[in-house]
Amino acid sequence: SELIHSLLPVFMVSVLGASMLTVGIIEGVAEATASIMKVFSGALSDYLGRRKFLMILGYALAAFTKPVFPLAHSVAWVFAARFVDRVGKGIRGAPRDALVADITPPQLRGAAYGLRQALDSAGALLGPLLAVVFMLAFANDIRAVMWVAVVPAFIAVALLMIYVREPERDSD
């Protein structure tokens, strides 16, 4: 996500002809959407007790938006993709954190959350750096660089589906 998101304002303004105000509105709505969804996803995760399902749903929604960005020929496409992407982010966050707590022994939870946050921060750092590297490698072809981000998004969903196991829940 960070690879695409770091390029998105430039893409919207220089390729799609959006104004800076439009970029601000799109980003504001997108981030507000993620925040609102987080409120409901935690309660839904606890109610359903199916954290893995909600995580996969959230990451899959985000993954399926990735090809929309390089295919976009209007700001409306980008807006729709950013909205769905942030719905996915909002859905996956609380269940992901709850699953970390569910599968981690109490004495290791701090370390587990620290590792999760460290990996998230690493992605936030590496995404924009890789965007620069790929922009240089692809001679500033921003759409080609966006296509690169599609691959890890779908790999992440596949890894979740294959390797993450939901713990047995008590039937209390």
Please place each PLM-identified region on the residue numbering.
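Helix-loop boundary and gating motifs at the non-cytosolic
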Residues: 1-35
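Helix-to-loop junctions at the C-terminal end of transmembrane segments
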Residues: 37-50, 135
